[in-house]
Amino acid sequence: MGSVRTNRYSIVSSEEDGMKLATMAVANGFGNGKSKVHTRQQCRSRFVKKDGHCNVQFINVGEKGQRYLADIFTTCVDIRWRWMLVIFCLTFILSWLFFGCVFWLIALLHGDLENQENNKPCVSQVSSFTAAFLFSIETQTTIGYGFRCVTDECPIAVFMVVFQSIVGCIIDAFIIGAVMAKMAKPKKRNETLVFSHNAVVAMRDGKLCLMWRVGNLRKSHLVEAHVRAQLLKSRITSEGEYIPLDEIDINVGFDSGIDRIFLVSPITIVHEIDEDSPLYDLSKQDMDNADFEIVVILEGMVEATAMTTQCRSSYLANEILWGHRYEPVLFEEKNYYKVDYSRFHKTYEVPNTPICSARDLAEKKYILSNANSFCYENEVALTSKEEDEIDTGVPESTSTDTHPDMDHHNQAGVPLEPRPLRRESEI
């Protein structure tokens, strides 16, 4: 127990390293027996970027400006803040200028600009365009300094004051509503929802599974959270039609309801590669040479605003690591659970993962090894226990139990005999 453990597992610490591992033939049974690196002559352009933005540009859209203006509220909510502020300022300035010109024309036609002594003006103290502009601002913003005011001499002036007040209320309601809707958008909530850099393919409960990890960096919950996934690839129909992006649903438990998750700690999403899976006929070598993209989607309601948010990411074929599992991130302490996000994107290699397709595995064309290898998660738990004993100054020789006591620092993800630990999906 006191000896230093050697690292028998390769750790993928970055997306770049993961891509290298995914495209290289590994010598210990992962490759095809030849020291050959599989590369693609044509690499698929990513349809959904890692940050969730769709890599799509629209061209030749007829009457685009008119269509956007017809839905001006959504346009204002979707545009950037700097353009929103420009629209905000221009709307008020133009309305003030318009009604300032109207009051100046009323004064001009009534002869108020000539300053005649016996002439009762339509708007008192308005003898220039500047004065008319200031009166327009005072009317719409209800400042009312008291020097300029409308009189009962001109009914048209009274009507314009009433009309400007109504228009000002409409502008205020529209601008405030657009700003509030833009501020309340759950778009920024996606910044605290993360997907793992790489997806993995490994055995789970005796079946070959595709897995990826999702996490919530906030303590506030995502209500009614659920996940979806689609595989995008090009294909040619039996009639010869070329479909550049054929969308195929990937089952993550919709029928059984396990697609709905309680996202408090990081969770590994599992897709069982069965006969209904689009990955059923893919072996490791086929995966290395494949050209497709898996789009993963996490949806839920923001707890603070009850608005629906959607977080997206994608994995190309060279970002799927065959024969890897994720490092454990959830640990059980004395009175709480601890999540270590430094391990969130890291994976380790599982040497006995079959390299055949799920179909060959189901048809018994590949014989699984019966050798039980010591699981890496158990090694993490044992190492953590040793560190606790060193920190507390308890000598290992004083322990009478041949198995380490895992009560104080259990990894909540892997069974360890003879005292089983709770699995990550059960917490």
Curated annotation (Swiss-Prot):
It is a multi-pass membrane protein. The gene is KCNJ2. It catalyses: K(+)(in) = K(+)(out). GO terms for cellular component: membrane; monoatomic ion channel complex; plasma membrane; T-tubule. Activated by phosphatidylinositol 4,5 biphosphate (PtdIns(4,5)P2). This is Inward rectifier potassium channel 2. The chain crosses the membrane at residues 82-106, 157-178. The keyword Cell membrane applies. Inward rectifier potassium channels are characterized by a greater tendency to allow potassium to flow into the cell rather than out of it. Their voltage dependence is regulated by the concentration of extracellular potassium; as external potassium is raised, the voltage range of the channel opening shifts to more positive voltages. The inward rectification is mainly due to the blockage of outward current by internal magnesium. Can be blocked by external barium. Probably participates in establishing action potential waveform and excitability of neuronal and muscle tissues.
